[in-house]
Amino acid sequence: LYEKNELTFAIVWIVVYCVLQSLANPLNQRIGIGYSASAAFCIVQTIILFAFLRKNKLEKRYGLCGSPVPARRFLYYVPLVILASGNLWNGVAFRYAWPETVCRIVCMLCVGFLEEMIFRGLLFTAIAKDNLKSAVIISSVTFGIGHIINLFNGSGMDWVNNLCQIVFAVAVGFLLVTIFYRGGSLLPCILVHSAINILSTFAEDTNLTAGMHLLHIGILIAVTVAYTLILTQTLPKHPWEASQR
């Protein structure tokens, strides 16, 4: 399937990933340990996808390698550390029993790899060959689409905060795809994605008011947008950009 159509291959992975995660939710409840089935499904998918990439020697094509661009050109990735630490700005809390905590960490670690490889690796690369702008937009927006569900799931946040969450997710999507296609490595994207997800497990948000949350998200959006603009202006352009002008 991959050799016939890379885009179809990417879409199949997206569908399988979403279906398995949906099926995992009721299984987590039956097992009685949060994220247990989710972690198991993610581990299996991670192993299969990584083995496929290794077998077909596609690691470099999809960014599982170091970047040829020096770290100083990325400001030593300090803004990514700031973004990853955002969940801990209001303090640290241990809210779950240790079995669920372990399952959450394992699941989120794998989710970082899977979502970056599927959306910013497989999907972006398949589209970028023909239309770089479309690839950037689609890859970035899909990162924010999942947050729309917070508008309807009774998360407790008002619609303004939820919309800011979506804007932040889309902004992060643009940032990560810029790091990948300008820097040639998906590893920083995987690491920061996993870190943001994992640290959310230990976030202290019991006393976080809507106003504080809005300020929090606003700062993260500002850091993300500023960092993206700096990278787009200073990093070397990818050959795709020159060939599609």
Where are the predicted features?
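Central hydrophobic cores of alpha-helical transmembrane segments
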Residues: 13, 135-144, 187-200
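Membrane-interface helix/loop boundary segments of multi-pass membrane proteins
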Residues: 114-140, 181-185
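Functionally important transmembrane alpha-helices
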Residues: 22, 161-218
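Juxtamembrane helix-loop-helix connectors linking adjacent transmembrane helices
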Residues: 29-38, 53-117, 124, 128-129, ...
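Alpha-helical transmembrane segments in multi-pass membrane proteins
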Residues: 5-54, 77-78, 98, 102-103, ...
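Membrane-interface capping segments at transmembrane-helix boundaries
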Residues: 54-61, 229-245
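Hydrophobic alpha-helical transmembrane segments in multi-pass integral membrane proteins
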Residues: 84-89, 142-154, 199-213
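N-terminal membrane topogenic signal
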Residues: 1-13, 70-72, 185
